From Swiss-Prot:
<dbReference type="GO" id="GO:0005634">
    <property type="term" value="C:nucleus"/>
</dbReference>
<dbReference type="InterPro" id="IPR015943">
    <property type="entry name" value="WD40/YVTN_repeat-like_dom_sf"/>
</dbReference>
<dbReference type="InterPro" id="IPR050358">
    <property type="entry name" value="RSE1/DDB1/CFT1/CPSF1"/>
</dbReference>
<keyword id="KW-0508">mRNA splicing</keyword>
<dbReference type="Pfam" id="PF23726">
    <property type="entry name" value="Beta-prop_RSE1_2nd"/>
</dbReference>
<dbReference type="InterPro" id="IPR004871">
    <property type="entry name" value="Cleavage/polyA-sp_fac_asu_C"/>
</dbReference>
<keyword id="KW-0507">mRNA processing</keyword>
<protein>
    <recommendedName>
        <fullName>Pre-mRNA-splicing factor RSE1</fullName>
    </recommendedName>
</protein>
<comment type="similarity">
    <text>Belongs to the RSE1 family.</text>
</comment>
<keyword id="KW-0539">Nucleus</keyword>
<comment type="subunit">
    <text>Associated with the spliceosome.</text>
</comment>
<dbReference type="InterPro" id="IPR036322">
    <property type="entry name" value="WD40_repeat_dom_sf"/>
</dbReference>
<comment type="function">
    <text>Involved in pre-mRNA splicing.</text>
</comment>
<dbReference type="Pfam" id="PF03178">
    <property type="entry name" value="CPSF_A"/>
</dbReference>
<dbReference type="GO" id="GO:0000398">
    <property type="term" value="P:mRNA splicing, via spliceosome"/>
</dbReference>
<dbReference type="GO" id="GO:0005681">
    <property type="term" value="C:spliceosomal complex"/>
</dbReference>
<dbReference type="Pfam" id="PF10433">
    <property type="entry name" value="Beta-prop_RSE1_1st"/>
</dbReference>
Length: 1143
């Protein structure tokens, strides 16, 4: 017998402040929104879509359902580099598509999707790392037959690679140079069937007196292994887009060149003629808008079938055009195809008549072609029609970009009543056209929601002989209610269950239903239902004491009585029968569990029983060792619920404790001994654990009655995998479920809903499904203008919008009070002045854009109760930053920082200080006299505000050692500042102890007056550099949530920085990261240290995105990392899991 005490991991987030931690652990919670898409059969099955994130650090793979017109995220792969371009290709004879990609690593890579993961098949270095104007990678074009590709830079460089097969492998040839002194705008691959590959480029020659744009064709001579540059063709300087035209037997070939209000079809010259440019060109009439604006095409997509092809093109206003060619008359025509609400960066047409539209700003869409408009005659002038009459939206893909501001830990209740989840990260982001509300929780898809007469105490479903759920059983204090599942769910009294007593447990065992009550158990044959004959039910009466708890599987039943455990088994060819004797318990049981019967076996060999002495026992029910205690586990509280569940070849015991802690214990499937354990606090109150099926995988639903509901599941996305135990265990994630917490839950399985969950929340019965790949719950509040800044006031969100310029309150997902402003707003804050009342201060620009020189500004004050306007103060420049300061208002106006008090008719200036450049952000540490000032060039300056006889005076105390273009600021603690800059850098700076002590003790500024600024800085002291890290996105807001920092990026990235206090744990994590980087160069071969230290070297931050590779790498590499770190596999995996639990 194995006896052990459960050890709980102590979170690194103890009472020690974040700033004093030994190291920070970085984790990307949400990658940026996609910017480009490719389609193909990447897994060799149905058509799929791959999208590239806006920051280039993630590849998203979606499966496409042609019937519903929707896509489902099935895999996310963090690339640990900046991928610049991706293209799909397929070599002749292959049955699946591959991906070729360029990145900032200076390496071109061929990728394959294999075993639910992207793997790199071949890497070929072509230039220096980083993104440079002369290093190829900005443009990538692949021959339609997959034979060659061209890689080009913005300036001069072009390389051509031949793609080929070497046995089962795909190889890339050495590069062929096609360099010319020019600036490149576009590169596309022409369709020439199986002739020599041809690429078309839009270029401007360098060095000419009056350069203009030119169309140049490059031919790869496969025989001579040489690239031929054809004579250039002059094209309009307004050329904005180019796309290839099908060639060979499918079309005329060549390219379509789009310029302002014009389209020209150019055909490449004869093969082999080095001096031949375009063999001919055809002008195509482009319809003109009635509004009179110019048509500038920026995106297009080609649909090609055996008998036709056409393009969908879009201009900068969102107008769509269908461009087609009559195969008989060879005449081109352009049909206005309606207008979209967004401008797209990428259009992709799928074979199922759906189109993927990735938006430049806002949500992306999946659209279905209702009609091709073949019967409609093209018109020369069109009126804007929105939405398009030819397209319908089948799915909206929620996107955050661009994010201008955010607030965290707020009530994200929206109009669809998807409520917040306690202790779950929630964000409201200010974006174009409204507010985006997101929570880091799974979103349930509600199928049925029906009221109940009163809340039940227990809930089950029971399956019929065909494997579908037949009954829903609800237990009340003195009765049992049975609902029959058919075309509708109705109450029934013919189930055979006893209805005038409460039920402890129900289940389907063999060919019978079992109903457990306090005095015993009823066994009802399934053949009884619907039969005219009344088959007798078997009654088993408890010999002594009462039945307290019970559990059943398809062939086993376990009953926990006051002081004993009884076991029943339904073997093939016999009825349910009790085993002679009982397992004696020293304490009353609180919960029991029996595992599902493994495939090919007649029984599960173990049961688990928890008792009120805070222990759980694993008991054998194998006939050869019946009722032998296999293991005993000590707990920190009584277990209120147990569940045994197999995931793959691993058996887990899931426990919900009375103190709100969820525990998962790994058992040896052969001996039943305890191998390892994992725990996490879910919520106050007794937890229940219920096995369910989500997405075809066995999962566990963890619920704290009325507090929080979570789903433990095998996670399909590599960037959020969490392991459950040893090195051979599958990976398990515990994610919160948004919405009203469930009081009761059970699995639900029918033909129409094979992987559902049924639950009770209050007095409402719900049936729902959960998509475990969608990690965020997302909602939106539409606004007329573009939200620029946010603040949170109690349960209300205040935002300022531009176009129109307004102050808007949002409460419970609905727009409340709206106030017009006197110009484009730039900043907002909540401030309590000396009168003790709360106000909202709004800064703005009076004349046009806030960035325009000479523009005046204003500061408007509104009451917090009803948004009543108090007064407006004119200032000489727009206040780009406002913050509250101990009963006063701090404003950043131009290069000045000013202190204002509330007056009767305007705010009154109390103090000011001149800094070197324009102030962009402010932060104040509550209760202190310190204000952090961020500017556009000189980084951060911390100022102290002292109250002297003459009034308030502002003194610069400490400034940065290097220049940074600050975009956001946050006071972590009294002496530490976190900031983000416009190049994607996250930095933490600390005030030197000498400067901090001086500021605290020099109340009369005797010494502060005498301090002279150092060179290139407004202050005498300089910050100590604490930490720095590159997050790949421009930070726009930094928040503190649950003792860790949350950073939101402009393009939708959400990152977390978690303090790791223990020096030993810090060293271990850094060592693991080092050897993980050494063991795998990644998909693109990017040096990880240089990538995360793009502009400033990484300091005191360990990259959790890289650490997670330990959990998904193959067994051989994991053992190698465990050996080199000296921690072993379980030690390395355990340390990564422990820190991941904190996010």
């Amino acid at each position: 017998m194995h006896n052990t005490n459960l050890k709980y991991f102590t979170s690194p987030l103890n009472s020690t402040t974040l700033a004093s931690s030994a190291m920070l652990y970085h984790s990307t919670l949400r990658s940026s929104s996609p910017k480009s898409a490719i389609c193909g059969r990447f897994s060799g099955k149905s058509q799929q879509v791959i999208t590239l994130s806006s920051t280039g650090n993630a590849l998203y793979l979606y499966s496409h359902d042609g019937d519903t017109g929707t896509v489902t995220l099935i895999h996310t792969h963090l690339t640990h580099c900046q991928v610049r371009e991706i293209r799909a290709f397929r070599l002749p004879g292959l049955k699946k598509d591959y991906v070729i990609a360029s990145s900032d690593s200076g390496v071109i890579s061929v990728l394959e999707f294999r075993h639910n993961r992207f793997v790199s098949l071949h890497k070929e270095a072509y230039g220096r790392s980083g993104i440079r104007r002369v290093v190829p990678g900005e443009f990538l074009a692949v021959d339609p037959k997959g034979r060659a590709c061209m890689l080009a830079s913005v300036e001069k460089s072009k390389l051509v690679y031949v793609l080929n097969r070497q046995g089962a492998d795909i190889v890339i040839s050495s590069p062929l140079e096609a360099h010319t002194s020019c600036v490149t705008y576009f590169v596309v691959a022409c369709d020439v069937a199986y002739e020599n590959p041809v690429f078309a480029a839009i270029e401007t020659p360098v060095g000419e007196t009056s350069p203009g744009k030119q169309l140049v064709f490059y031919e790869l001579d496969l025989g001579l292994n040489h690239v031929i540059r054809k004579a250039p063709v002059d094209i309009p300087n307004s050329t904005s887009h180019v796309t290839a035209v099908p060639g060979g037997t499918d079309g005329p070939g060549g390219v379509l060149v789009f310029s302002t209000n014009a389209i020209v079809h150019h055909v490449a010259g004869a093969a082999g003629g080095a001096s031949t440019g375009a063999a001919g060109s055809t002008k195509i009439a482009l319809p003109k808008p009635a509004a009179g604006y110019d048509n500038v095409i920026v995106a297009s997509a080609l649909h090609q079938s055996r008998d036709l092809f056409f393009y969908i093109a879009q201009n900068t206003r969102g107008d769509l055009f269908k461009i087609s060619r009559d195969s008989e008359t060879q005449h081109w025509s352009v049909l206005y195809f309606g207008t979209m609400s967004c401008v797209c960066t990428s259009l992709t047409i799928l074979k199922s008549a759906h189109m993927v539209c990735l938006s430049e700003q806002g949500d992306s869409h999946m659209m279905f072609f209702e009609s091709l408009g073949d019967d409609d005659a093209p018109e020369n002038v069109y009126d804007v029609i929105s939405p398009s009459p030819y397209l319908t939206v089948t799915q909206t893909l929620f996107e955050l970009k661009p994010v201008f501001d955010s607030v965290v830990g707020v009530n994200t209740t929206s109009s669809d009543h998807v409520g917040p989840v306690p202790n779950v990260l929630s964000l409201i982001s200010a974006t174009r056209g409204g507010l985006k509300l997101i929570s880091h929780a799974l979103k349930p898809s509600i199928i049925v929601a029906s009221p109940l007469p009163e809340p039940p105490s227990k809930l089950w479903t029971m399956r019929d002989g065909a494997g579908s759920d037949k009954y829903i059983v609800l237990s009340y204090a003195n009765a049992t209610l049975v609902l029959e599942i058919g075309d509708s769910v109705v109450e029934t009294t013919s189930s055979g269950l006893t209805l005038d007593k409460p039920t402890l447990h129900c289940g389907s065992v063999g060919s019978s239903y079992v109903q457990v009550m306090t005095d015993g158990m009823n066994v009802i044959p399934m053949s009884r239902e619907g039969s005219s004959e009344s088959l007798p039910a078997t009654k088993w009466t408890a010999p002594s004491g009462q039945v307290i708890c019970a559990s059943s599987s398809s062939h086993q039943v376990v009953l926990g009585l006051t002081s004993s455990l009884f076991y029943f088994e339904d073997t093939p060819g016999s009825e349910l029968s009790a085993y002679d004797g009982a397992y004696e318990l020293s304490s009353p049981p609180t919960a029991v569990a029996v595992a599902p019967v493994p495939a090919g076996r007649v029984r599960s060999p173990f049961v688990a029983v928890a008792t009120d002495d805070e222990t759980v026992r694993i008991v054998s029910v194998d006939p050869e060792s019946m009722f032998e205690t296999v293991a005993v586990q000590g707990l920190m509280a009584t277990a209120s619920s147990l569940a045994l569940l197999s995931v793959g070849q691993v058996l887990y015991l899931h426990m919900g404790l009375a103190n709100g802690v969820y525990v998962r214990v790994e058992l040896d499937p052969l001996t039943g001994e305890i191998v390892g354990s994992w725990s996490k606090f879910v919520g106050l109150g007794r937890l229940s654990v219920v096995p369910v099926t989500c997405g075809g995988e066995e999962s566990i639903l963890v619920s704290s009655r009325g507090v929080k509901t979570c789903l433990g599941h095998v996670n399909a996305t590599s960037d959020t995998w969490v392991p459950t135990g040893g090195n051979s265990a599958p990976f398990f994630a515990l994610d919160a479920i948004s919405g009203e917490p469930l009081d009761l839950a059970h699995s639900f399985h029918t033909q129409d809903c094979p992987h559902g969950v049924i639950g009770v929340a209050g007095s409402t019965l719900k049936i729902f499904t959960v998509n475990t790949a969608q990690k965020w719950t997302e909602n939106e509040v539409k606004l007329e203008g573009t939200a620029k800044r946010l603040i949170q006031h109690d349960a209300t969100t205040l935002t300022i919008t531009q176009n129109p310029d307004r102050l808007v309150s949002v409460d419970n997902g609905a727009v409340g009070i709206t106030k017009d402003l006197g110009g484009p707003p730039t900043s907002i804050c909540e401030v309590m002045f000396g009168d003790g009342k709360r106000y909202f201060a709004v800064g703005g620009s009076r004349d046009g854009s806030p960035g325009t020189s000479g523009t005046s500004g204003y500061i408007s004050i509104f009451s917090s109760s009803s948004l009543g306007h108090v007064h407006t103060t004119e200032v000489e420049a727009p206040p780009l930053a406002l913050c509250a300061y101990n009963g006063l208002l701090v404003a950043g106006i131009g290069s000045q920082v000013r202190l204002y008090a509330l007056g009767l008719k305007q705010v009154l200036r109390k103090a000011q200080i001149e800094l070197s450049k324009r102030v962009t952000c402010l932060a104040h540490f509550a209760g202190s006299n310190r204000v952090a000032v961020g500017d556009i060039r000189q980084s951060v300056t911390v100022c102290v505000v002292l109250e002297e006889d003459s009034g308030h005076v502002i003194y610069p105390l400490v400034c940065d050692k290097i220049s940074r273009q600050v975009t956001c600021l946050f006071f972590v603690d009294y002496e530490t500042v976190a900031l983000g800059d416009r190049f994607g850098g996250f930095t933490m700076l600390r005030i030197p102890s000498e400067a901090s002590k001086l500021a605290d003790e020099d109340h009369n500024a005797v010494h502060l007056r005498q301090l002279e600024p150092t060179l290139n800085g407004p202050a005498h002291f300089r910050f100590d550099h604490v930490a720095s890290f590159h997050i790949e996105d421009v930070p726009v807001a930094i928040h503190m949530y649950n003792d860790y920092l949350v950073v939101c990026g402009l393009l939708g990235t959400v990152s977390a920085f978690v303090p790791v206090v223990s020096p030993k744990q810090s060293r271990d994590l850094k060592t693991i990261e080092k050897f993980v980087c050494a063991s795998d160069p990644g998909l693109m071969g990017r040096d990880h240290g240089r990538f995360r230290g793009y502009y400033v070297p990484v300091k005191e931050v360990v990259d959790g995105d890289m650490l997670r590779e330990v959990l998904v790498m193959d067994e051989k590499r994991r053992e190698e990392v465990g050996e080199k770190t000296g921690l072993g596999v379980e030690g390395a995996v355990g340390r990564v899991v422990n820190v991941m639990k904190c996010v």
